[in-house]
Amino acid sequence: MQIFVKTLTGKTIALEVESSDTIENVKAKIQDKEGIPPDQQRLIFAGKQLEDGRTLADYNIQKESTLHLVLRLRGGVMEPTLEALAKKYNWEKKVCRRCYARLPVRASNCRKKACGHCSNLRMKKKLR
């Protein structure tokens, strides 16, 4: 049977499949046609993300059905160099206990007039 896969760019791909094919097989066929690795593909049908181990029949996908292909988003990890930079500019600071002004680590007095340039400073609390 023939099914269609629609990408986010609007391109529609026709695939020849069987209802007993797994989602992994469909992703492999998409890789053959489009060159997108299966681990980056997410297939959506009827508002549900399709799981790799299941078959087309499990999701009641019939001939001429349309699946939607979206790419998996990666993220959540900060590079060590960026993390060090963030620490340098955001975390390693002193804070005035009276006016809460952020100050450099080497500061001994506050720079603000509002608190009278007091020397009552503390280190900024670390994020967890």
Swiss-Prot record:
Pfam families linked: Ribosomal_L40e (PF01020), ubiquitin (PF00240)
PROSITE patterns, per database record: UBIQUITIN_1, UBIQUITIN_2
Gene Ontology terms: cellular component: cytoplasm; nucleus; ribonucleoprotein complex; ribosome
Coiled coil ranges: none
UniProt signal peptide: none
Record-annotated Ubiquitin-like domain positions: 1-76
Key words, A-Z: Cytoplasm, Isopeptide bond, Nucleus, Ribonucleoprotein, Ribosomal protein, Ubl conjugation
Superkingdom of this protein's organism: Eukaryota
Biological processes, Gene Ontology terms: translation
Sites of the Glycyl lysine isopeptide (Gly-Lys) (interchain with K-? in acceptor proteins) crosslink: G76
Family: In the N-terminal section; belongs to the ubiquitin family. In the C-terminal section; belongs to the eukaryotic ribosomal protein eL40 family.
Other comments on record: Ubiquitin is synthesized as a polyubiquitin precursor with 5 or 6 exact head to tail repeats. Some ubiquitin genes contain a single copy of ubiquitin fused to a ribosomal protein.
Name under which the protein is recorded: Ubiquitin-ribosomal protein eL40 fusion protein
Organism encoding this protein: Trypanosoma cruzi
Name of the gene encoding the protein in the UniProt record: FUS1
